[in-house]
Amino acid sequence: MGLGQSTEQAGHSPEQLSHVLAERFATKCFTPLELTHFKDNFFSRAIDQEGIKYWSEKILSDFLGIPDSSDSHCPLDAGPVLFRMVSYLGAFPFQNTMAPSVLTFEAMVKVVVLLTERYGKVLRRARRDRVKLLFGSLADVGRRGAGQPPDENADNKEEDKSSTAKSHATGFAVDDPANDNYEDDEDDDDLVLAALESLDAIDVFKHDSRVDKTVYEARISVATFRRLLMLLIVIAPLSSLEPVKKYTSDLNEERMDNVRQEADSILAAFDLNKSADGISFQSFSEIVSGSLPYLFDPLTTLFEHLLFSKNLDLSQKRGGTETTIVADTAEEVSESPLSSPSSIMLPGSFESTILKPSAISHLSFFLSSPATDVNLLRGNMRLHPVFSTVAHGSSLTSFSHNVLTWNSGTLLLLEGAVTESSDRGVGTITLGAYLPQHWKSGPLAHSPSRPFDSLSLPCLFELSPKHLLMQGNTSPSVHKPNAPSAYFSTNTGIAIGCQIPPPSRSQQFEPTPLGAGSLIIDASLESATFYASPIGHNGVFLPSPSVSKNGSETTSKMQIDIYTLEVWGLVPDPSDETLTEPGHNAIERQRARWDFEAREAERRRSLNLKAGAGDSAMEGARWLLETAGLIGDRPGRSGGSM
């Protein structure tokens, strides 16, 4: 498994360099307490064969709580997929020639560091990008020395290690490598280069990269990737200290149908019609980096479970035996009932018909929490019900009362049927818009003209039947008063990502699509029009990688009959102890505004506009009612924007 004379010139073999890197990872990327827990988790479960301690696929799946083929009661079967990924990553930075690796403690140290992105303390020049490593761990890349058969002695030694190791080699058939005209970018190997530079072993990398250059010309099988996607969707809300079975123990038929639907929607983004033999690296890199930046975040919290051992109780005396502690702990864990998973949705005036758990997981793969660079489920944010056509009716008056009084970011979701007149075939579609800035009432001059920072950009997206994400435009030139992120008018309805015409007394003009994506909802909240273009950088939203890669320059237009329209407010977790001033909470501010409006309405009842009032009193009363929006229609007061 070594690299011959070329490595001997450097004075170190790949095995020795891999050992040194694992030691540096262990000492610099974990705290002493984390490393103690890690060692206890590993060595208390490891198989010992001829002095080599390692984990099999069964041990890995059982510890993480990941269903595999032995769990007949669970429809998920992601254990073998995770095992092949871990076996590949365990050979880092020589995964081209040494993968699949035996899961020794050193290999598992590298796996946890890579999947939890802790390598920055050692690999300072490395770009925080795991896309290429993750692709290699899922694709069939011929990992034993450019197609040469494995050593017979090695087969004899590993014969009894794991019956599932054979499934790792043959159970995930991926089509033969194909040339995708992909131009290799040296920057994509930053992780490997940084690792070997830290070990003064660049010559080893040059040899290793020549051995198997087809590693990134291979493809990921759709079946393998679907199994991983379904697991990621199920465990997306998982925290570092939660048991995985909390999310996998109650996968009934309805829940699994929803999970499969979300997984198929994500798979559709990779344009499988043009590459039926699997997912190429170019497609994988473009979609994951540009459209699903948080897709693999659940693996971070999953593998952080290795850094907490239930066997260790630091309050106990050192005289206690380890076996007794393990047995007692295992018995307590098995007897303790699993609590229900917490929901990101807060109770309120309605329950969502769109936001099922699998849809929320899908959202967390590309939406970040406001002002933080973590996904929606990791940023301590909650969704408060603000408006729903099911609960509040299809009325712009009700929309205005509930949405324009909400002083925080919102998430707008729409579900409906695509009509026959659309460019795409008929079927159900789910769209949405992420709007970090709150809606504002008043003339267009009140809409923000300054550019948004990178963490407060809006986005327009499609959840199903095909994942589509149009990110917010960072260019200062597109943030104009007549092109707000979202606009509301009692005359024309709701416009997202559109150009708003100037007000006119004689003629009513409709908002027009602008840039790469727009959504227009009519004043009755019964129909909508969705525009998606592969070109156009002059609007609020940029082209989606899923649309751009199709090669067409035509703008697709979809007419939609709306079933349900929902608006959810973004608020911090109310249970957060750092929230000491409830007046800054959007929920409290909205209630205070409603109370004020109720008091003003009560006060207006005493006004008599017909009898006993002079001209000045009449004008004052009329001004009050116009200000409240109850009568009159002053120019510029019929709309609101963001």
Curated annotation (Swiss-Prot):
Residues 177-186 have a biased composition (Acidic residues). The keyword Cytoplasm applies. Residues 143-186 are annotated as: Disordered. Its main location: cytoplasm. Keywords: Cytoplasm. Residues 154-163 have a biased composition (Basic and acidic residues). InterPro entries: TLDc_dom (IPR006571). This is Restriction of telomere capping protein 5. Pfam families: TLD. Residues 353-571 form the TLDc domain.
